Every structure is written in C-alpha cells, then in structure tokens.
C-alpha cells in the first residue's frame, strides 16, 4: 500500500487528475483515507496529496480531492518556500504563498480555515503578503482573514509586505485598519522594515497614515536604519518629513556617509565625503551654537586615528581613500555604539579588502576588533573564527609571517566561543539543537586548524607557553563531537573535515605535530569515543601507511609514549591491534607493545568473566573495564 501511496502522491504533485482518479478507483473507503492522508517525505519536505497539489497550483486535482473524496482541508505538512522551511503549513497556506488564486478560492469555499497558523504562527494571509498577491490578500480578508495576527516574532502582515516592497498590499492593509505602529519582537515597526529595504513609496504611504518615528530594540529609528543601510533617498525623505532635532539630523547624515565607505553592495567614496561634509557644515552652521563631536578614544584597529572634528580636518582627507574608510568605521562605531549588531559587518568587509590586497596586518587588526565586539555582545562567532584560520593559512602558504600573539588571541576567543556553544547546545530547544551542534563542531575543527597553524609559526618560548595555556584550557573543558570524539581523536582521524578555502593548503589530518602538542598540553591519551575507541584505535585504521608513513609512525609513538594502552578494548571488544587495517600499522603497533603486569591481570579478569565490580578499588574498576 505504501508503494501505491507514492504513485498517488506523484500524480497529485504533477497535476495528473485522470491518473489519480484511476489509482483511487474501486478502492475501499479505508484505503482511500490511508492513501490521501499518507504523508510523503521528499527533500526535507512532508506533504499529503492535497498539500502538494495546492502547492503546485493543480486546481483540478484539488477540486477532485475536495469534492469527490472529501479530504480534510486542515491537513498540515512541512514545505520549503524561498529558502525557508515552513512547518505546520496547510494546503491553503501553500496555495496563498505560491500565488495560486484559483486553488485558494477552492479551499476557502470548502471550509479551509483562513486563520490557521503554522508552527511559527504564520497565516495564509501572511504568506500572500510575502508574495505580494493583492488579489489573494483581498480575497482572504473578504473571507474573514485577520490582518492583525502576527507570527512568533510579532511580525505582522503589514511589516512583511513593507519589507518585501509590495506597495499596493501595504496600502490595502492600511485601508483595512492595519496598525502602522505595531511593534515586532525586535521593537521594529513597518516603517523600520520599509526604510531598511529602501522602499520609498511605502515609507511615504506609512507616513501618510501617521506612522510614528520610534526606536527599535537596538535604539535605531527608521531614519537611522535607512542611513545604516545606505538608503539615501529614504534618509532625505525622512529628514524633510520627520520632526527630528538638529543632533539627530547630523547623526543621520554622518551615519549615511560612513556606511557608504565600507558597504560591499553600496560602496561609494564620493557619497561618503559628500554626506560627512554636509553633516559637518550642519554642526558649524550656527557659530554661536556649534555642536562639537564627542569623539571616541583612538582605536588600534583603526590606526589610532581620531575622528575629524571640523570641516578643515575633513577636507584634509578628501583625497585619502584609506583615511575615509577608517573615518567611516569610527563614525559608525560612535553613532551606533560598540554593542550594535550591525557595527562589525563593515569592519569585516574592510578587513577582507585588505586581505585581498595582501595587506594582512591591517586585515587582522580589523578582524580582531570585530571579533572582540561580537563576543562582547554575546554573538555567535564561529564564522569569524574560521575566517582567521583561513587568512592565517593563506599567509603561511604565501610565506608571510603569522604573529604568535595573534594566534594566541584567536585561540583564546575560540576557547570562549566553544565554552559558550557547549552551553547553547545544552540549553537550546530541540528544534534548534541540530544547527547549534553544527556550529559547535565547526568551532572544534577551527580550533584544531589554529593549533595546526601554530605548529608552523615561529614562536618565542613565552609565546608558546601562552598558546599552550589556551590549548590546555580547552582540553580541560573536554569538548566532544556527536560521536564522542575528543580533540585528540580528531587530530589523529583522516575523516576530520578541513575547510577548503586556503585552510587545506596548510592543515591536514591525521597530524603528528598537533597530536604531540595536544598530548603535551594534557590531552587524555586513553579517552574513548561513543564506540569505546581510543585515539590509538583510530590512527591504526589510517589508509595511507606508505605515502604518509612518518605521520602514522610519529602518532603511534607519541600516543604510546604518553601512556596509550595498546591492549585497550572498545565496545566491540576489539583492541587497536584488532582494528588495524594495514600491515604497516600492525607492525608499528607490535613494536611498541609493552604489556605491563597490571594490563595482563586486567585482561585475565575480563577474559575469565570474573566479577570485579565492588570487589576492587573504584580507581581500578575503570582500568579493568578498558580491557
């Protein structure tokens, strides 16, 4: 019956109404109920024949299912729309989101709930507003769709239509008394969303309906949001309409100019100078009431520059692009505040431009500053840390010197991030745990890349001690992957993933130097993964024993010298020798096997199934268990 359900689903998906009818012909009522309620899974999506037919706009199939087979309209599934995964979507939600008006009308006329919500509290009306289908929006509202239902982030239909730029939908919702001043969870209103996206007609419409100028949760007004997003026409419109004081006006112009200096999509150094100069003139227009800047203390990452405080200082750097770039970063940090989520993006962009031009020292200064800002704001920094591994690898590959203090600094930040991500994984909801675990494991791999890079860097004894301290700090936390791998397991494993953007030019696993360094910093040599395998169990399965003999040999020697038990058994009762997949690793292992009397006794206890629990000291129980 499951195979037949697959054919039924395929026919519904492809709009083959005659094929579908033939497949269901002469079936019992219970069989039909099973076939039309069967949830098919495909590419991360879960849907029934009705849901997929509605999603794909097959009105004839939908009509057949509703009128002839009385399929329930409230069936729910999981679908993908514009890169988003929508859980708990009905056929009506799918039809509205995909713009299939005929299907929408069919479903509503057969009793579909127009206010049914998905898991994230999204309604069919919201889906239609996202897509900008005014005809569907009107039809749903005329059939009692509630325009005030917000999603789980308190984001309303008006907000999504404003952000997506659907002016006609925005106008209609406002005419239907949608609240222009409703606030999302982040404190933003529809005006914030329209201003950020640069939809000037929608901004005008919202102003006409008396949308209030308020600050969001990050202390940003729509004017500031538009300036930060380089939406000059919106800024100029709001400045002409909004009742803002002189200081707010100046800061908006400064922020707009500063943002043009370091925005990948909107970079325009001429506009940077233009708006910064306009703002400066506003500061000095009243000689009796000059608005002096409250400049930030010099910041190392910005070349210890001090922000221009008068028109003459600004004119002096007019032709100096690099100075204007730094001026832009300084101005943004002053106006937005160091804890603002958007401050770091242009810093990272400017650093990347330096890296592309082989100006690595300046790149690293900026990226370290951005990393500290993001960690101070408790932001997820796994991408930032990986970026350092990539640029350090690129430098080594190009024979550029990497400074040990820079590596130590990033390692320290990496330890902090891994500790925080371990806590996130423990305390996060089941729905988000997979993503959190991915980020956490990515951080572990990045840490290993950084350790590997440190082994290829000239270090003083003091620098090496500082690096080793960070490695020790992380080992002490005992971070584990899903498989229970420790850092040592990962260091000896050929399956440990290596990032392919510059990093794989320098880093590879198994890695003898990384293994030795981890052991020197206190890694537990006999720690086991979820399958009971020690690092020695892993390395003897390395499948390049000839071409990479030195690595295999060095790692086995390091592990054994650090106290690895060569007779330790995993959950399959296999020793490293049993797990050895090549003659070379077998020979290497045998030459290192020095069985102690203690090990022989433990193996005898296990081999003869002698009860030892609670019969010997607790410290020995674990030891016997290993054997």
UniProtKB/Swiss-Prot annotation:
SUPFAM superfamilies: Ankyrin repeat
ANK repeats: 45-74, 87-116, 120-149, 153-182, 186-215, 218-248, 483-527, 531-568
Regulation (activators, inhibitors): Activity of the CRL2(FEM1B) complex toward FNIP1 is inhibited by BEX family proteins (BEX1, BEX2, BEX3 and/or BEX4) in absence of reductive stress. Mechanistically, BEX proteins act as pseudosubstrate inhibitors that associate with FEM1B via zinc in absence of reductive stress, thereby preventing association between FEM1B and FNIP1.
Family: Belongs to the fem-1 family.
Residues where Zn(2+) 1 binds: 185
Keyword set includes Nucleus: yes
An example Gene Ontology biological process: protein ubiquitination
Tissue expression per record: Present in adult testis (at protein level).
Subcellular location: Cytoplasm; Nucleus
Record keywords: ANK repeat, Apoptosis, Cytoplasm, Metal-binding, Nucleus, Repeat, TPR repeat, Ubl conjugation pathway, Zinc
Pathway given in the UniProt record: Protein modification; protein ubiquitination
GO CC terms: Cul2-RING ubiquitin ligase complex; cytoplasm; cytosol; nucleoplasm; nucleus; ubiquitin ligase complex
Protein name per UniProt: Protein fem-1 homolog B
Function: Substrate-recognition component of a Cul2-RING (CRL2) E3 ubiquitin-protein ligase complex of the DesCEND (destruction via C-end degrons) pathway, which recognizes a C-degron located at the extreme C terminus of target proteins, leading to their ubiquitination and degradation. The C-degron recognized by the DesCEND pathway is usually a motif of less than ten residues and can be present in full-length proteins, truncated proteins or proteolytically cleaved forms.
Disulphide bridges: none
Molecular function terms from GO: death receptor binding; metal ion binding; ubiquitin-like ligase-substrate adaptor activity
TPR repeat ranges, renumbered to this chain: 344-377
Self-association and partners: Component of a CRL2 E3 ubiquitin-protein ligase complex, also named ECS (Elongin BC-CUL2/5-SOCS-box protein) complex, composed of CUL2, Elongin BC (ELOB and ELOC), RBX1 and substrate-specific adapter FEM1B. Homooligomer. Interacts with PPM1F and PHTF1. Interacts with the death domain of FAS/TNFRSF6 and TNFRSF1A. Interacts with CHEK1. Interacts with NKX3-1.
PROSITE patterns referenced in this protein's UniProt entry, alphabetically: ANK_REP_REGION, ANK_REPEAT
Transmembrane segments: none
Binding site for Zn(2+): 186
SMART domains on file: ANK
Binding residues annotated for Zn(2+) 2, in chain numbering: 186, 218
Matching Gene3D superfamilies: Ankyrin repeat-containing domain (1.25.40.20)
Site residues (Cleavage), renumbered to this chain: 342-343
């Amino acid at each position: 019956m499951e195979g037949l359900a697959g054919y039924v689903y395929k026919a519904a998906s492809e709009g083959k109404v005659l094929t579908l009818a033939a497949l269901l012909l002469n079936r019992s009522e219970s069989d039909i109920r099973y076939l039309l309620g069967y949830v098919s899974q495909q590419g991360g999506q879960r849907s029934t024949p009705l849901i997929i037919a509605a999603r794909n706009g097959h009105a004839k199939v939908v009509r057949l299912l509703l009128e002839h087979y009385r399929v329930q309209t409230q069936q729910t599934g999981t679908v993908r729309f514009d890169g988003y995964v929508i859980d708990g979507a009905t056929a009506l939600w799918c039809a509205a989101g995909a713009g299939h008006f005929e299907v929408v009308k069919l479903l509503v006329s057969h009793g579909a709930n127009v206010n049914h919500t998905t898991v994230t509290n999204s309604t069919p009306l919201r889906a239609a507003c996202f897509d900008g289908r005014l005809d569907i929006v009107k039809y749903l509202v005329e059939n009692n769709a509630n325009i005030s239902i917000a999603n789980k982030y308190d984001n309303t239909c008006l907000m999504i239509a404003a952000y997506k730029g659907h002016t006609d939908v925005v106008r209609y919702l406002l005419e239907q008394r949608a609240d222009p001043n409703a606030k999302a969870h982040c404190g933003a209103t529809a005006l914030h969303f329209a201003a950020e996206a640069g939809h000037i007609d929608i901004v005008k419409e919202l102003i006409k309906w008396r949308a209030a100028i308020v600050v969001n949760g990050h202390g940003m007004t729509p004017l500031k949001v538009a300036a930060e997003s380089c939406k000059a026409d919106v800024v100029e419109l709001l400045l002409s309409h909004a009742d803002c004081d002189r200081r707010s006006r100046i800061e908006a112009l400064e922020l707009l100019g500063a943002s043009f200096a370091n925005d990948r999509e909107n970079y325009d150094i001429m506009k940077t100078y233009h708006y910064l100069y306009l703002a400066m003139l506003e500061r000095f227009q009243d000689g009796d009431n000059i608005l002096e800047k409250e400049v930030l203390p010099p910041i190392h990452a910005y070349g210890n520059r001090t922000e221009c405080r008068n028109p003459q200082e600004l004119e002096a750097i007019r032709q100096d692009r690099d100075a204007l770039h730094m001026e832009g970063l300084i101005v943004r940090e002053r106006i937005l505040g160091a804890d603002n989520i958007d401050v770091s993006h242009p810093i990272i962009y400017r650093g990347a431009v330096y890296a592309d031009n082989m100006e690595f020292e300046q790149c690293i200064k900026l990226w370290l500053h951005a990393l500290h800002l993001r960690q101070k704001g408790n932001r997820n920094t796994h991408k930032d840390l990986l970026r350092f591994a990539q640029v350090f690898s690129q430098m080594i590959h190009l024979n550029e010197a990497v400074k040990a203090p820079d590596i130590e600094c990033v390692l320290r930040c990496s330890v902090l991030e891994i500790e925080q991500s371990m806590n996130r994984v423990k305390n996060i909801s089941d729905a988000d745990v997979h993503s959190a675990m991915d980020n956490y494991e990515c951080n572990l791999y990045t840490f290993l890349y950084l350790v590997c890079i440190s082994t290829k860097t000239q270090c003083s004894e003091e620098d090496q001690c500082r690096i080793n301290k960070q490695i020790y700090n992380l080992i002490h936390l005992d971070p584990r992957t899903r498989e229970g791998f420790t850092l040592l397991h990962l260091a000896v494993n050929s399956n440990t993933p290596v990032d392919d953007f510059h990093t794989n030019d320098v880093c590879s696993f198994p890695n003898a130097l990384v293994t030795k360094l981890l052991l020197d910093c206190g890694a537990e040599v006999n720690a086991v993964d979820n399958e009971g395998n020690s690092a020695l169990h892993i390395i003897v399965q390395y499948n390049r024993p000839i071409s990479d003999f030195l690595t295999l040999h060095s790692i086995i020697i390091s592990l054994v010298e650090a106290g690895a038990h060569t007779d330790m058994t995993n959950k399959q009762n296999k020793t490293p020798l049993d797990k050895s997949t090549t003659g070379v690793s077998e020979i290497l292992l045998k030459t290192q096997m020095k069985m102690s009397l203690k090990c022989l006794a433990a193996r005898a206890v296990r081999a003869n199934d002698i009860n030892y629990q609670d019969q010997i000291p607790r410290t020995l129980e674990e030891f016997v268990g290993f054997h």
